[in-house]
Amino acid sequence: MMSNQKLTPVFIRQKPFLVNLNAWLFLLLLVAFTTGCSNKDDKLPILGQREAVTKTVDGKEVVDSVYHRIPDFKFVSQYGDTVTARALDNKIYVADFFFTTCPTICPKMKTQLKRVYDKFKGNPDVMLLSHTIDPEHDSVAVLKEFATGLGVTDRQWLFVTGPREDIYEIGQNSYMVTAQEDQSAPGGVVHSGAFILVDKEKHIRGVYDGTTEEGVNKLMADMDKLLRESQS
């Protein structure tokens, strides 16, 4: 079983390619440990903090572990409609953070996420969710134009905006990646270059380098594995 540890944020600044190596090494060790302790089905580990809760079963109190989940949220998509966590019910999905005028890692990230979109396009069990961290500039119209430029005209890949504080909050405290203002960074913000894989129960099952082909190859392989798991 996985040890009771909080998922360390993957910290990638808006400078290609400055990474918090200690965080990456810790995460790799954590994943290696949990994978090694997984069951014979070789399921992906559930990442994040676990909380012990007491409940009554057959008249007896037992202690159970509750895994970290992505909570509900309320954002607006490139189509102008409200998007909540319910839109992702019974889906596995990949989440990331970006902004349309990003001068550094975002173009690499979107090139790689487009590969994921193309591979799983039309699969009703898969969605992609990209959060802008510059909502003042990235209006619904801007996001729609950006999505169209990538060849995205359906609802399988949603680009969402909302109050800046809500986006930063869900990034740092729910997906546990960096998303914040930083006037010393290009564009005035700093965010993670990670892609976060979330299962149908809203658990985080993997964190991947979204700026490299190798990282995204691993993501897509794990998505296939997670789809098989959810169908078994």
Task: Give residue ranges: language-model regions.
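Thiol-based oxidoreductase modules, predominantly thioredoxin-like and allied folds used
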Residues: 125-139, 155-165
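Thiol-/selenol-based redox modules, centered on thioredoxin-like
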Residues: 181-232
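N-terminal targeting signals for export/organelle localization
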Residues: 2-72, 230-232
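Short active-site neighborhood of thiol/selenol oxidoreductases, capturing the structured segment around
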Residues: 83-113, 129
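Short, internal strand/loop/helix patches
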Residues: 144-192
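Short loop/turn microsegments at loop-to-beta-strand junctions
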Residues: 70-71, 93, 192-194
